[in-house]
Swiss-Prot record:
HAMAP family: Ribosomal_bS16 (MF_00385). Keywords: Ribonucleoprotein, Ribosomal protein. It comes from the Bacteria. The lineage of its organism: Bacteria, Bacillati, Mycoplasmatota, Mollicutes, Acholeplasmatales. The keyword Acyltransferase does not apply. GO terms for molecular function: structural constituent of ribosome. One of its GO terms (biological process) is translation. GO terms for cellular component: cytoplasm; small ribosomal subunit. It comes from Phytoplasma australiense. Belongs to the bacterial ribosomal protein bS16 family. This is Small ribosomal subunit protein bS16.
């Protein structure tokens, strides 16, 4: 079973709201999922992610889609081996 981290659409017409979920790659976009990793509000541009869950699923071999990878890059720093490292805080 190949696991993907992808966006699951919610909201109403012209007001999308997404959940970042870990799901089987063979399941439809809005189908069953294994775990909710975070949320993404496109209107207000608010991204909320559970850091522990993100690292857990990436260490299990989950492959983020291109859009989720961009969201993760906004909040984290990718290393070469696709592991996530928290950014350093300013001193």
């Amino acid at each position: 079973m190949a696991i993907k981290m992808r966006l699951q659409r919610f909201g109403v017409h012209k007001r999308p709201f997404y959940r970042v979920v870990a799901s089987d790659s063979r399941v439809t976009r809005d189908g069953k999922f294994l775990d909710i990793v975070g949320t993404y509000d496109t209107i207000l541009n608010i991204i909320k992610l559970d850091n522990e869950k993100v690292q857990k699923w990436l260490s299990c071999g989950a492959q983020p889609t291109q859009t989720v990878k961009k969201i993760l890059k906004k909040n984290f720093v990718f290393q070469k081996d696709n592991q996530i490292k928290k950014p350093q805080t300013a001193k």
